[in-house]
Curated annotation (Swiss-Prot):
A motif (ThyX motif) lies at residues 100-110. Keywords: FAD, Flavoprotein, Methyltransferase, NADP, Nucleotide biosynthesis, Transferase. The active site is at R196 (involved in ionization of n3 of dump, leading to its activation). Its EC number is 2.1.1.148. Its cofactor is FAD. The keyword Transferase applies. Pfam families: Thy1. Homotetramer. This is Probable flavin-dependent thymidylate synthase. Pathway: Pyrimidine metabolism; dTTP biosynthesis. It comes from Streptomyces phage phiC31. Gene3D superfamilies: 3.30.70.3180, 6.10.140.450. Signal peptide: none annotated.
Length: 237
């Protein structure tokens, strides 16, 4: 599994300065100042009440302001900043689970256009490194043989490559690898984490959620400051 940040929201502070004389610090990844994503959430919230003077010491800083937002559940201001990930070598099963999060946007490798005959399976965490991995890989190889044979048979009958693959892909297991680009705003990613960064979640998508959280700690640390370092439910609650 490979999860990498492909794009994040960049903040242009000039309009806020011109309109409200509001100064924001948005040097991304500088620990002494809020990141662009965190600064945007704060700026959006302050516009609601025009509270640009930072009179309340408890919410004068970006961590304090966003901490109060999180405590009150006013997550709408987190919808302005987005993070895009390049995700590789996850299973089709994970894609099925992740696509239930309606506010994410997906661009996924096509099983109709792209040949899958030489792919490697995504081994579930429970099987990875155990005596079950070898037969698991053998079963996947057999499925690929059936897939490849199906494509060739349909091609011999006059079907084009796309038509042959669209029929033969029904033979591909859930372990077939998927590459995709996934975009979500911070509120959407928090929703993913709340459901998938949990001991009761599917093991592979829980691993994915952990990778996402690691990146969000760099991109928007104050917007996920309440997220636990261990999956929800680890303490038995």
């Amino acid at each position: 599994m490979k999860v990498n940040v492909l794009a994040t929201t960049a903040l242009n502070p000039s309009p806020l300065l011109d309109a409200y004389e509001y100064r924001v610090s948005g040097a991304a990844y500088n620990r002494d100042r809020p990141t662009d994503a965190d600064a945007l959430g704060e700026a959006a919230g302050r516009i609601c009440y025009k509270s640009f003077e930072r009179k309340n010491p408890a919410t004068a800083s970006n961590p304090g302001y966003l901490g109060n937002i999180l405590a009150q559940g006013h997550f709408s201001v987190l919808e302005h900043a987005s993070v895009t990930f390049l995700v590789r070598d996850v299973s089709r099963a994970l894609l099925t689970e992740l696509s239930r999060h309606r506010h994410l946007s997906f661009s996924v490798v096509s099983q109709r256009y792209v040949d899958h005959a030489d792919t490697e399976p995504v081994v579930p965490p429970a099987i990875r490194g155990t005596e079950l991995e070898k037969p698991f890989r053998e079963d996947y190889a057999e499925a690929l043989q059936a897939y490849d044979a199906g494509v060739k048979l349909l091609r011999a009958r006059g079907y084009g490559r796309k038509q042959a693959r669209e029929a033969a892909r029904a033979l591909l297991p859930n372990a077939a690898p998927v590459d995709m680009v996934v975009t979500g705003n911070l509120r959407a990613w928090r929703d993913v984490l709340g459901k998938r960064w949990h001991v009761a979640a599917d093991a592979e998508i829980r691993e994915f959620a952990g990778r996402v959280l690691d990146h969000l700690h760099a991109v928007a640390p104050n917007s996920v400051q309440d997220m636990p370092t261990s999956p929800f439910g680890s303490d038995g609650k």
